[in-house]
Amino acid sequence: MNKYDRFLTRGKPIDGSKDYAYGTLNIIEVCPSPIKIGQEDTDCNLYKITYRVPNTVADWNLPYPQKSTFVKPETVGRYTGQDDVLRNKIFEGDIVSFDDINNDRVFGIVIFNMDTLSWAIADAYKIYYDLCRASDMSIIGNKDDNKILLKNFEWNWSEYV
């Protein structure tokens, strides 16, 4: 794992692009207006991902050229440090499949388990699997692009996504 990968984050740009932006997440606090004119109070932070631009020349004494894009907060996911069988990076919010100890095919969503402070996979029955066997996993989608996959489960995924 690259030393910068532990900070790798992805998110969907607010401009409506279907592709994720990958890079370092910056959360910019925007002070809410002291006067509200009939508007709901929403998240007052802006989420921006900064990423490298290959094959360009840096300026302002930066070690490499950078660009930034604002992303939707609900699509932000952190890199887990693990790769799947095809060496794709596994991010928070990915939907994965793997064989459990009984060789049954399991589908679940990658979450950060706050009880154990570790990466885990929650399946349709709220059973948590450790992410340590990521080399046997396949990414089959993610929570943002494949909402139909989440509808097949019996319990409410909204507490995890």
Where are these regions (language model features)?
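Secondary-structure transition motif
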Residues: M1-V161
